[in-house]
Amino acid sequence: MNAAHLSLAEHAARLRRRELTAVALIDTCAQHHARMEPRLNAYKTWDGARARSAAAAVDTLLDQGQDLGPLMGLPVSVKDLYGVPGLPVFAGSDEALPEAWQAAGPLVARLQRQLGIVVGKTHTVEFAFGGLGVNAHWGTPRNPWSPHEHRVPGGSSAGAGVSLVQGSALLALGTDTAGSVRVPASMTGQVGLKTTVGRWPVEGIVPLSSSLDTAGVLTRTVEDLAYAFAALDTESQGLPAPAPVRVQGLRVGVPTNHFWDDIDPSIAAAVEAAVQRLAQAGAQVVRFPLPHCEEAFDIFRRGGLAASELAAYLDQHFPHKVERLDPVVRDRVRWAEQVSSVEYLRRKAVLQRCGAGAARLFDDVDVLLTPTVPASPPRLADIGTVETYAPANMKAMRNTAISNLFGWCALTMPVGLDANRMPVGLQLMGPPRAEARLIGIALGIEALIGQGHALLGAPDLP
């Protein structure tokens, strides 16, 4: 097998058999970074020297027969919202946040206890408030699948998927408030998991929305996602990693409304082809309108909860930053300042009602399938103003935001390429705290249709 396609589990096994050293693995990642980073711009901060020192320490321990956990020695990129000791946190803004933000929160601490190796901090949209991945302060990462035009990578975890395609990391930590893991995963041909609110702690992560923020991961395959989830999820400690669910007899719901509106025909075709493969393999596919989508998305379109919560957070902690925000972020923050407390509380109540009502469908289906993103990643030049950016940003998050607003878990996995030769994602949605089951279903689908590198081929990288 091509070493570039080895799974996390295979890398971990080779490290423990001493067929591979952690230093050699980090050196390979650093070589990929050095060759491609000037073009792709995945990272705000690259920490290659410390990563190599950490790898040498891992090798010493492995030579002594010590094993500190499944992620030991594996290279991980971390979104620049997370605190990582010794690395500045910018949160996509024009200056580093106070040093206290460098403290590791519970999720990074879990990674570090296992001696997973942080190779660097990846770019984010400023304060994570955007779905396309743009950043006016530090530059927008380039989608690796677009060799001749600068297309966006998706956001707000803008550099996360790029780091995986680049080969500088094998696992990426991101966050998801309206699609910020799944949109970049979809647009760069990766797998991305949005956890249920509260499943993984968000302490030690710069907040966007106190109501909706979730920690998540991006991986190259669903197989890798299952491995990483088992390693990071405390509720799964002592349990085996999620196992593939049989496709035959699987009850698959395909919503007919909202998710397919004004969709790129080539994206619709790729997703529908995946659904048909499931039906041919014995899945029971049923189609119906998903209730409350339009009502919930109308709230999202008017700022949802996140805009008001970010405005309040900035006003309390960083009021001096507001006028220096990227204009595509600043305008929405300013607009949210006009939302009354009564309207904010009304929105919360409506969204709770909508999510609970729509979740009753999971009594009759095991999973909901939709396109992850309904449009091809736009060219950066085509979204250079607030007026051109706003509709493209809203459309990018239209399908992913529903699971956030409803309080569900969700993931995306690649299923093909669109007419622009850009990756297409299939979104799986499940009820709250059903992550392990959802990953198992995705494993079954991946076994049927193939992993991303087999489905998509390889991008034309430098």
UniProtKB/Swiss-Prot annotation:
Q: Which Pfam families match?
A: Amidase
Q: Where are the transmembrane segments?
A: none
The organism's lineage is: Bacteria, Pseudomonadati, Pseudomonadota, Betaproteobacteria, Burkholderiales
> What name does UniProt use for this protein?
2-amino-5-chloromuconic acid deaminase
What's an example Gene Ontology biological process for this entry?
A: catabolic process
User: What does the function comment of this entry state?
Assistant: Involved in the biodegradation of nitroaromatic and chlorinated nitroaromatic compounds. Catalyzes the conversion of 2-amino-5-chloromuconic acid into 2-hydroxy-5-chloromuconic acid and ammonia. Also able to catalyze the transformation of 2-aminomuconic acid into 2-hydroxymuconic acid.
Q: Which residues form a coiled coil?
A: none
- What protein family does this chain belong to? Belongs to the amidase family.
**Care to name a GO molecular-function term for this sequence?**
2-aminomuconate deaminase activity
Q: Which UniProt keywords apply?
A: Aromatic hydrocarbons catabolism, Hydrolase, Plasmid
Would the keyword S-adenosyl-L-methionine turn up in this protein's UniProt record? no
What pathway is this protein said to act in by its record?
A: Xenobiotic degradation; nitrobenzene degradation; Xenobiotic degradation; 4-chloronitrobenzene degradation
Q: Give the E.C. number(s).
A: 3.5.99.5
Keyword Metal-binding in annotation:
no
